[in-house]
Amino acid sequence: MFSKKQLKGKRETMHNSICVIRRILRDESNKGQRFRRLLMSVGWQIWKRTIAKPIVATLFNNCRFIAHPDCQVSSGVFYFRVPDSREVKVLRRWLDGGVLIDVGSNVGLFALSLADKVDHAILFEANPLVALRARENMALNSLDFEVNATALSDAQGEIYLEDRGKATVANRTLLDPATTTYPVRRVPRTTLDIFLKNRLKPIENLSVIKIDVEGHENSVIKGMSSTLTELRPKIVMFEYLQRTKFHETQKLFGAVGYRIYRLDKRNEFIEVVGQPDPLQNLFALRGDTEPQTGE
């Protein structure tokens, strides 16, 4: 007989498995290979639980990626032909060279998904282990993309980073360690404005900025106001969570001439009016930029 706790755990596992299957079947990048992706997902789960060693996978754009069994991001490489396909498809349409800045890059999968569309990329990842893996992924593809093991914020110094173990994507950047029940570590932080000011080689063509820092987005945006004003990237993609103060986000972008959009079901940009639904990626477009579709 199972205890109530064990039964609850099994129900959660079953629910999560069903959700994953639905995502695999519904993902638009899996068209024509959905059954194959289901088999690959099962194979990856078996590999994680038995062999439990890293494996090199080839992405849709022929970049190679080191998939680690303890890395949540790695699963997406097997589940989907194009991980984060909607956002990647839209950004690939916008990009034609230039520089990508990836804030909260994790192991570098997002940067690799755009690697053939940019001239250079600068990655920021506060978790030292994860930053190391990002460097390994760049080296595997002979890319000279920069990986910085530091957090971006609105000030210089140090900040706290949750340590939930392994290479989880859920670690939050915190000003006060008392706001989490997880262990924390101190990590260096700076602002994008200061980083670029001190960089020996100035950026001439900043195309896109992507931000995914688990609720610390507004602080990152505060620290890049000069960058947005002077370098004027066409688009900034950022994750929006329930705990993010969206009115503050709008104010920050509005002050430097950017408007915020979301993607509709047809991958077309719709300007955000009011409070958007949480748990989605939003896009700040330069005021003189004409929205394009992802089709």
Where are these regions (language model features)?
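Phosphate/nucleotide-binding beta-alpha loop and adjacent structural elements of enzyme active sites
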Residues: 2-295
